[in-house]
Amino acid sequence: MSEQDSKWKFLIIADETPEFMKVLRLASKRAEKVGGSILLLHIIPPADFQHWTSVKDIMEEEAMEEAREQVAIHAHEIKRISGLDAETVIRKGKSEDVISEIIAEDHDIHLLVLGAEVDGDPGPLISSFREVLLNVLHMPVLVVPGNMTDEEIDKFA
């Protein structure tokens, strides 16, 4: 097995939840420490709008542009924290389908890192993981509580 084959790749899913920045920090620090890499995935949910194709196309293009901007911001933050250049992917679809596809396509992914809100509903990705992904993914999952401080994350990583 070559050194490249043994690198750990951490999959993180960009979203607008407050706990995502905790996920980004932990994955960045840990990947830096173990000589790994990060795959930053942004998922654009399927458009619900079906009346006029041209309006749907405009909405999808706006969503794609916003996703590109967010991914660039997050990739810059990963670089700032760890010095690593994240691999970035933007896909359209249902989150559980896209995550399953990415993991099936990229055999270098060793760990899925998700964030969870600690008060009430743990968040859409954790709920989806629990209901769907747990049955099809055969890899470790690290869940980062949204109430961890940066100091706690740095100590853990």
Outline where the language-model segments fall.
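General small-molecule cofactor/ligand-binding pocket signal
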Residues: L39-L41, E87-R91, L142-V144
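Structural beta-alpha unit
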Residues: M1-S2, R80-L112, A157
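Short, well-ordered secondary-structure micro-motifs
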Residues: V23, Q50-T53, S100-E101, P124-L125, ...
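Small/aliphatic-rich secondary-structure junction motif
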Residues: S2-S54, V136
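Gly/Ser-rich helix-loop-strand patches that form or flank binding pockets
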Residues: E105-A157
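Active-site phosphate/pyrophosphate- and oxyanion-stabilizing loops and adjacent acidic/basic residues
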Residues: S28, H76, E101, E131
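Helix-adjacent hinge/juxtasegments
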Residues: M59-E87
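Acidic, proline/glycine-rich short linear motifs
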Residues: H42-E69, E151-A157
